[in-house]
Swiss-Prot record:
Keywords linked to the UniProt accession: Cytoplasm, Isomerase, Porphyrin biosynthesis, Pyridoxal phosphate
One Pfam family it belongs to: Aminotran_3
Catalytic activity: (S)-4-amino-5-oxopentanoate = 5-aminolevulinate
A GO cellular-component term linked to this record: cytoplasm
Requisite cofactors: pyridoxal 5'-phosphate
Organism: Clostridium beijerinckii (strain ATCC 51743 / NCIMB 8052) (Clostridium acetobutylicum)
Subcellular location: Cytoplasm
Record note on quaternary structure: Homodimer.
GO molecular function: glutamate-1-semialdehyde 2,1-aminomutase activity; pyridoxal phosphate binding; transaminase activity
Chief place where the protein resides: cytoplasm
Protein name: Glutamate-1-semialdehyde 2,1-aminomutase
Length: 431
């Protein structure tokens, strides 16, 4: 069957033909290719078209598709176990690995997704502090938990909606909105509500309004305010954890969070999530404390095995991060040079192996308001050109592009060649 026929039939059985909205390509006005296989950085659709992949399952596949060691670990465990709903040594192994290798995580609780991790961390913060209010930042996405679906970045921006139907005002009345990288605004917010704020949740490297790194003095301000008012600082490292550095985005700042959430890379490509922090806080979770959270598939042995294989490989090959940094810099520099050559207004934001090309004529993109000024129509033309040229990119101006250890200079150079063709066409259109 052709891709378009499969997608058309999918629309009869799944809302929008997909199980997560951005996959429908609605924002770029195209039909998505239907992917059937992947190895390394090459994925293949049902018509046997091949694409160089810069989405990598939205970030988890830092080792590339079907890494041999990860697949072998999955095979080995799946021959003995699928699920128990009981303690296993594998979950201890992964928990111990994370707690001994990361700075600020003394205890950890496994869950099944990034959304579960963030919503559970917020519940824990509320239970620990006995307060209700949570601060999130405009443009940051922390999953589809009701309390977060306000000013939530890519998912709702791409769909052209401010939030989500089905979320009553009561669900968000205790959510306060901060402005990313704005010290003065967050300080004023704390002056007004500080003694009611249970916690502040932030992507230290935002990825769902495009890639924007928190500024050092802004992060220090958050830490100081949380200390002053007795609130918890929660880092959402679902996307940045183990990606921008082995120890994640928190290693890029001289700031310690109280709680951290993980997913994506830590599951090796399988459904996974976790949240952790100081023992003093984590011991408030049931069965030790009064904050209840549970899950049938939490700590699933196959997922734990995939996570252990992935994280061990990253720890034992720290040069992987050097490689990703080098090819990322090559891609960034190439895009900037080509854009200047053809008078194409762009801003490139990159932190390690995650980056966003903003079609924006500002000098820098550092806030959600800056992101809103992007030329979405130009992005859509760029996306279509690159897809036809054999590149799988995020189908949204407001998402991150990802690199893996399997990307080579030849893949980057091929990308830049296709991008230059696009830039030339845009230049001709403007004449």
């Amino acid at each position: 069957m052709k891709n378009v026929d499969i997608f058309k039939e999918s629309e009869e059985y799944m809302p929008g033909g997909v199980n997560s909205p951005v996959r429908a390509f609605k924002g770029v006005n195209l039909n998505p290719p239907i992917i059937k296989s992947g190895k390394g950085v090459i994925i293949k659709d049902e018509e046997d078209n091949e694409y160089i992949d810069f989405v990598l399952a939205w970030g988890p596949l830092i080792l590339g598709h079907c890494d041999d060691d990860v697949v072998e670990a999955i095979k080995e465990v799946s021959s003995m176990a699928l699920a128990f709903g009981a303690p296993t040594k594998l979950e201890l192994d992964l928990a111990k690995f994370i707690c001994t290798n990361l700075d600020n995580v003394e205890m950890i609780r496994m869950v099944n997704s990034g959304t579960e991790a963030t919503m559970s961390a917020v519940k824990l913060a509320r239970g620990y502090t006995k307060r209700k209010r949570i601060v999130k930042f405009a443009g940051c996405y922390h999953g589809h938990f009701d309390g977060f679906l306000i000013e939530a970045g890519s998912g709702v921006m791409t769909g052209g909606i401010p939030g989500s139907l089905g979320v009553p005002n009561e669900s968000i009345e205790n959510t306060l909105i901060g402005i990313y990288n704005d010290k003065e605004q967050i300080t004023e917010l704390f002056k007004k509500y500080g003694n009611e704020i249970a916690g502040v949740i932030i992507e230290p490297v935002a990825g769902n309004m495009g890639v924007i790194k928190s500024e050092n003095d802004f992060m220090e301000t958050l830490r100081d305010l949380c200390n002053q008012y007795g609130s918890l600082l929660i880092f959402d490292e679902v996307m940045s954890g183990f990606r921008v550095a082995f120890k994640g985005a928190q290693s890029l700042f001289n700031v310690k969070p109280d709680l951290v959430t993980y997913a994506k890379i830590m599951g090796g490509g399988l459904p996974c999530g976790a949240y952790g922090g100081r023992k003093e806080i984590m011991k408030n979770l049931s069965p030790l404390g009064g904050v209840y959270q549970a899950g049938t598939m939490s700590g699933n042995p196959i997922v734990m095995a995939a996570g252990i294989a992935t994280l061990n490989k990253l720890k034992n090959n720290q040069n992987y991060y050097d490689h990703i940094e080098n090819i990322g810099a090559r891609l960034e520099e190439g895009i900037i040079n080509i854009s200047k050559k053809y008078d194409l207004p762009v801003v490139m934001n990159r932190v390690g192996g995650m980056m966003t090309l903003f079609f924006n004529d500002l000098k820098e993109v550092r806030t959600y308001d800056d992101v809103k000024k992007c030329d979405v129509n130009r992005f859509n033309r760029y996306f279509e050109h690159m897809l036809k040229s054999g590149f799988n990119l995020p189908p949204s101006q407001f998402e991150a592009l990802f690199l893996s250890v399997q990307h080579k200079e030849s893949h980057i150079d091929a990308f830049l060649k296709a991008f230059e063709e696009f830039a030339l066409n845009e230049n001709k259109m403007s004449l």
